[in-house]
Amino acid sequence: MTTRQHSSFAIVFILGLLAMLMPLSIDMYLPALPVISAQFGVPAGSTQMTLSTYILGFALGQLIYGPMADSFGRKPVVLGGTLVFAAAAVACALANTIDQLIVMRFFHGLAAAAASVVINALMRDIYPKEEFSRMMSFVMLVTTIAPLMAPIVGGWVLVWLSWHYIFWILALAAILASAMIFFLIKETLPPERRQPFHIRTTIGNFAALFRHKRVLSYMLASGFSFAGMFSFLSAGPFVYIEINHVAPENFGYYFALNIVFLFVMTIFNSRFVRRIGALNMFRSGLWIQFIMAAWMVISALLGLGFWSLVVGVAAFVGCVSMVSSNAMAVILDEFPHMAGTASSLAGTFRFGIGAIVGALLSLATFNSAWPMIWSIAFCATSSILFCLYASRPKKR
């Protein structure tokens, strides 16, 4: 193995471990949602808001960290964000009311955004478009370990300890990640390539992205794809645990099926993206999600049972990494000179739409799985429509 291959492996592995923080802070927490509702004596919608505010903070944080990463470099931004993430996790563990937890989760998400933005920008500094998509697939492959194990670990933490310890574990993980960043990650943006941090320049860069209708459509399509998955993350614990009577400690095993599909589709993407291109892989992922959403609606109408929903959700979620990595590859290829800003806006759309959809879904009454199913179907349809709009022939 060459030095370059060793270096690539090390970068992918470290960034994959760093990227675990975001899914860990959601997926380990999912089995605790019904328990937290009962402990604080609040309805399911109030507890779901702790997820929505986390995603909202994550979305807004992208707008902050992207321009900062283009101006001050990648390493100081991600290191600072990860340390704040650890502090916010401690604050969540010490929350005494649901309102305190909702507020602290917002700051938790705000800090978590640093890693997401910097990982995308750092990888784009190193790799061209098709190689970027391939290497990002491997980052996401490493990251799948977290959501595979997180709900299982979270469920057993609930059995043996309490939901507070979930956040103590997250704080410890963030401190370890900070040490890896400090000692093992090198700066990839030299000073001569950095953009001055001026509000006018930042606004101008965002305006350039908004004027690019095709790229904007890809951002929206990717955003609704993620929002479909977030519909499950927000409502799934209640649909599985309360409506279908899955034990909290067993929820993680059902969730693991999603990760199996995610693993398979990530491998599929890494094998074929060089052959058929990032854009075609992106479109394929969206169409698979649309078909799976239609399957969930039809199977619910026909009363095909709980497992038809479980499989449909798993296949839908399995395509998220393929959609996200290829969408980011296409978007950053258009704006390589401001990869941090472009990555931040794409992330804001992805997680902002997820936060809005999750907040609206929290208003629903969960006597059945229908609110979640309709939300997923709406998001999948929206993704396809934006993708079709972006694929229209250019006017001469």
From Swiss-Prot:
Pfam families linked to this entry: MFS_1
Function description: Involved in sulfonamide (sulfathiazole) and bicyclomycin resistance. Probable membrane translocase. A transporter able to export peptides. When overexpressed, allows cells deleted for multiple peptidases (pepA, pepB, pepD and pepN) to grow in the presence of dipeptides Ala-Gln or Gly-Tyr which otherwise inhibit growth. Cells overexpressing this protein have decreased intracellular levels of Ala-Gln dipeptide, and in a system that produces the Ala-Gln dipeptide overproduction of this protein increases export of the dipeptide.
Keywords assigned by UniProt, alphabetized: Antibiotic resistance, Cell inner membrane, Cell membrane, Membrane, Peptide transport, Protein transport, Transmembrane, Transmembrane helix, Transport
Keyword Transport in record: yes
Record's bilayer topology term: Multi-pass membrane protein
Keyword Protein transport (UniProt): yes
GO biological process: cysteine export across plasma membrane; dipeptide transmembrane transport; protein transport; response to antibiotic; xenobiotic detoxification by transmembrane export across the plasma membrane
GO molecular function, one term: xenobiotic transmembrane transporter activity
Family statement: Belongs to the major facilitator superfamily. Bcr/CmlA family.
Transmembrane segments: 9-26, 49-65, 77-98, 106-122, 138-159, 166-185, 215-239, 251-268, 286-302, 309-332, 345-366, 373-390
Residues in compartment: Periplasmic: 27-48, 99-105, 160-165, 240-250, 303-308, 367-372
Domain of life of the organism encoding this protein: Bacteria
GO cellular component, one term: plasma membrane
Matching InterPro entries: Efflux_drug-R_Bcr/CmlA, MFS, MFS_dom, MFS_trans_sf, Multidrug-R
Subcellular location: Cell inner membrane
Topology, Cytoplasmic side: 1-8, 66-76, 123-137, 186-214, 269-285, 333-344, 391-396
Descriptive protein name: Bicyclomycin resistance protein
